[in-house]
């Protein structure tokens, strides 16, 4: 699923593959160990917030189908978050949790200690702020661990290029890597993709997606508490800061970017966008609360994405495709159930229905784990990093277009030299200076479209 017009991108991927094939990580002497079907898989959870806790529970849920699996180590920078996560996981899977005090690791170095506690061939779950993905992935490869990466996997050009190189190194060691774009594992959407490829609604001319609701996660943040460092505050409220997560745009909109581009069978080549901040009072985060993006594919097809994080407004959380012979619902109201359908008209009325995936449907958050663990058990090739990087890049492309007020191309985003948070692999203390510093008023720099054009803040 690659822009066919894009020779520079093809040259880059070829070069990145060559670098990966010709190089080895320092100290990467630990071989990959393929676990037998009845051998216990050990799991380490790095990042113990809500998404990490959910991912760990989904991993443990595979035991009845795919063999024994146990959580043996956890790491987080906040001790209370680790304790809360451990309690929740034990409530559902007590017999599959063996995480004593000496395997509960707190601090920036905790990710290493947690992975060191897992036998080669086990699984590391990364659900920390996305800025740390490449740092943690690099160490997992060195340790010979399979990996689950929560989305997004990158937030800028330099880390995207780095992750593509690491993907090649993971392949070289036979590691299996899943990425938390779970709608790709939705069986209904998989069938919809095949139907669209078969021409059920004709040639796709337009896609559109909406994510409109009130404040979610840590998207909006007020002034920092006086007893907390900027670094810890930014990690705790990572959705508010572009260096940590790509902001709410990257962290929340990536699923619909991914599912729409999947149905098209291509990635867009450019984007232009608008966005703004409203009614924000003393908020100090970097996010806009409304975004509107027009993505363009190489063949001229358009993909329109509208996002709004604002109370009191019309809410919608859905994606659609429109073709020359009809239309399709890609998602209905959130990620699951998808309730995908095709229609012989653009009206999407019941009387025009061609096909609908039978209900109820299985949860893709569980299916993505079954697919990953099956690949580990059967030693099948499985690496979703490249697609995860591409989805992250396209999302970042739309975000940067809104934040700068410019048309941004895929090539430009991939090769952009600006790294939001260089040197994260060197940080060892929570007292380290934050990658983003506040002004004298305690507020952080925000995007200024048309004024700041070469970078987002």
Regions found by a protein language model. Give the residues of each.
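N-terminal secretory signal peptides and thylakoid transit peptides that target proteins
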Residues: 1-20
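Predominantly a Rossmann-like dinucleotide-binding segment in NAD(P)-dependent oxidoreductases
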Residues: 47-52, 172-178, 183-285, 293, ...
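N-terminal Rossmann-like dinucleotide-binding module
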Residues: 19-96, 260, 453-455
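C-terminal helical cap and adjacent loop that interface with cofactors, partners, or active-site loops
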Residues: 16-21, 28, 54, 232, ...
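A structured beta-alpha segment of the ubiquitous adenosine-cofactor-binding alpha/beta core
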Residues: 92-126
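Loop/turn elements at helix/coil->beta-strand transitions in domains of secreted/extracellular proteins
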Residues: 39-42, 67-70, 100-102, 119-124, ...
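Beta-strand-loop-alpha-helix segment that lines the small-molecule cofactor/substrate pocket
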Residues: 134-185, 199
């Amino acid at each position: 699923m690659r822009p066919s017009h894009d020779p520079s991108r093809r040259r880059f991927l070829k070069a990145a593959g060559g670098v990966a094939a010709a190089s080895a990580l320092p100290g990467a002497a630990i071989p990959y160990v393929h676990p037998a079907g009845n051998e216990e898989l050990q799991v380490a959870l790095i990042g113990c917030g809500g998404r990490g806790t959910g991912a760990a529970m989904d991993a443990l849920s595979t035991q009845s189908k795919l063999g024994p699996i146990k959580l043996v180590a956890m790491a987080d920078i906040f001790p209370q978050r680790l304790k809360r996560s451990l309690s929740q996981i034990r409530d559902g899977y007590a017999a599959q949790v063996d995480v004593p005090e000496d395997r509960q690791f707190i601090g920036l170095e905790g990710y290493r200690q947690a992975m060191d506690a897992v036998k080669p061939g086990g699984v590391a779950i990364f659900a920390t702020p996305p800025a740390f993905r490449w740092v943690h992935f690099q160490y997992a490869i060195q340790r010979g661990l399979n990996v689950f990466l929560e989305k997004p996997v990158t937030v800028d050009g330099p880390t995207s290029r780095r992750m593509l190189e690491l993907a090649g190194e993971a392949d070289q060691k036979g590691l299996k890597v899943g990425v938390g774009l779970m709608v790709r594992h939705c069986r209904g959407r998989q069938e919809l993709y095949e139907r669209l490829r078969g021409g059920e609604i004709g040639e796709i001319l337009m896609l559109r997606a909406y994510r409109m609701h009130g404040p979610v996660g840590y998207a909006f943040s007020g002034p920092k508490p006086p007893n907390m460092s900027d670094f810890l505050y930014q990690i705790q409220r990572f959705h508010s800061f572009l260096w940590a997560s790509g902001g709410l745009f990257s962290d929340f909109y990536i699923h619909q970017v991914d599912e729409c581009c999947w149905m098209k069978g291509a990635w867009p080549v450019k984007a232009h966008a608008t966005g703004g901040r409203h009614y924000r009072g003393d908020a100090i985060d970097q996010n806009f609360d409304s975004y509107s993006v027009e993505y363009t594919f190489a063949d001229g097809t358009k993909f329109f994405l509208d996002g709004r994080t604002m109370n009191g407004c019309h809410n919608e959380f859905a994606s659609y495709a429109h073709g020359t012979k009809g239309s399709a619902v890609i998602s209905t109201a959130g990620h699951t159930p998808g309730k995908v359908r095709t229609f012989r008209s653009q009206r999407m009325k019941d009387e025009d229905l061609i096909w609908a995936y039978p209900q109820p449907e299985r949860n893709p958050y569980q299916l993505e784990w079954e697919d990953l663990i099956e690949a580990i058990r059967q030693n099948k090739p499985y690496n979703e990093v490249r697609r995860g990087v591409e989805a992250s890049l396209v999302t970042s492309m739309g975000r940067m277009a809104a934040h700068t007020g410019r048309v941004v191309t895929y090539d430009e985003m991939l090769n952009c030299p600006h790294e939001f948070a260089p040197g994260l692999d060197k940080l060892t203390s929570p007292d380290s200076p934050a990658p983003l510093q506040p002004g004298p008023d305690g507020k952080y720099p925000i995007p200024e479209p048309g004024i700041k054009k070469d970078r987002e803040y």
